[in-house]
């Protein structure tokens, strides 16, 4: 019989995660004078949310949002249901009104890398992200008006243009620390004039 040499499968570390560990972490530690390496801000999770308000009238619309989010994030999103009924919006409790996916670990790093290097530069007339959308604790939320900027989405197969909200949660204590981290990761912020 022949012996097969079993080599352990090498795990590919995301490019942005490697860059963070090798250069960004040390730069931030020097900039903010942290005494402990664990005080350096890092990414915790990225939440991608797609609200589909018209799904109250047509329940098939939620399927398109789920399909688009699955292609963009690489994982199946959670369907968001209405918490309470609102008669003016013809909304019943439990109706699907959106979808969201929470990315952590390597999927999060890959998504942020694709977002910064591929998706954001494809936006027409893009001038940069606003630096005023931090929440006071170093977390950043911004909205995108359409999903076609992601190269995973086939423009011929989309049923309608949908926007999305993306929240980047960090361990930063202040907005300045969060901004420095995201800028180092490649987020294109507008230069405030």
Swiss-Prot record:
GO BP annotation list: translation
GO CC field: ribonucleoprotein complex; ribosome
Source organism, top-level taxon: Bacteria
Database matches in HAMAP family: Ribosomal_uL5_B
NCBIfam families noted in UniProt: PRK00010.1
Protein task: This is one of the proteins that bind and probably mediate the attachment of the 5S RNA into the large ribosomal subunit, where it forms part of the central protuberance. In the 70S ribosome it contacts protein S13 of the 30S subunit (bridge B1b), connecting the 2 subunits; this bridge is implicated in subunit movement. Contacts the P site tRNA; the 5S rRNA and some of its associated proteins might help stabilize positioning of ribosome-bound tRNAs.
Protein name, per record: Large ribosomal subunit protein uL5
């Amino acid at each position: 019989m022949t012996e097969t040499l079993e080599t352990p499968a090498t795990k590919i570390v995301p490019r942005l995660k490697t860059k963070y560990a090798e250069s960004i972490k040390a730069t931030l530690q020097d900039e903010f004078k942290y005494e402990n390496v664990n005080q350096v801000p890092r990414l915790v999770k990225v939440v991608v949310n797609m609200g589909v308000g018209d799904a109250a009238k047509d329940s098939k619309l939620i399927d398109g949002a789920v399909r688009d989010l699955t292609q963009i994030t690489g994982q199946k999103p959670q369907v968001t249901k209405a918490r309470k009924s609102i008669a003016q919006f013809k909304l019943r409790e439990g109706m699907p009104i959106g979808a969201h996916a929470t990315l952590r670990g390597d999927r999060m790093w890959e998504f942020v890398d694709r977002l910064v290097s591929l998706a954001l530069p494809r936006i027409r007339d893009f001038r940069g992200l606003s630096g005023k959308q931090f929440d006071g604790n170093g977390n950043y939320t911004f909205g995108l008006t359409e999903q076609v900027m992601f190269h995973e989405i086939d423009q011929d197969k989309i049923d309608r243009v949908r926007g999305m909200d993306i929240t980047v949660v960090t361990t930063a204590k202040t907005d300045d620390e969060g901004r420095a981290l995201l800028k180092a990761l490649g987020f294109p912020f507008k230069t405030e004039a």
